[in-house]
């Protein structure tokens, strides 16, 4: 599948992103880590070696790979991605984020058409916003997850983020004070910006239990994550679990993964 890059009209957001890219090129952000630099180097090598159009698609993780540790994209990465598009390579972001939480540096990048989000549980057309496929957690499994964790929720030891049709929802007490639920200070601004608060998250989950792309359990005490993970997977065979950070346990349908999400495109 070949996509020719078309320039998108600039908005104030695009202008701001462009300025950030220019600053990054002149004065590299000190948070740009070795992992991101290695990614840039490997991406440029792949494009350079793409003789005869052998490479048709590049699937990209986002956080701490395509994006730097502060969530921004370097000028070098942006240039490499645009070069890939111009060389007829389909660029496909694949992320644990929900669709509505994708950064503007990705959504406004010309030439990107499809994105696999919620750890591959959903695939969206980035241009139209239409969901073109995916998996939702079985309603019986949603209820089982709540039954196994709701007591801890009532005690303030865990809380939930749920992704419904590309949008992240969370309990209003958590959105107001993420740090009280184990979220590090560096992630507070992102959490408040992208999570839509509801008064009663458990009732919200039950109301939408047939629509959940993902349930993320946020852990006040990260040391219990592995034990909880094992207990959930043992009791509920219809789910898939993963974790990108120590305070978060991400749950999707058992068939959902970044690889399976890519298979829908």
Q: Model-derived features: where do they sit?
A:
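Mg2+-dependent phosphoryl-transfer enzymes with acidic/Ser/Thr/Gly-rich catalytic loops
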Residues: 2, 40-57, 73-74, 234, ...
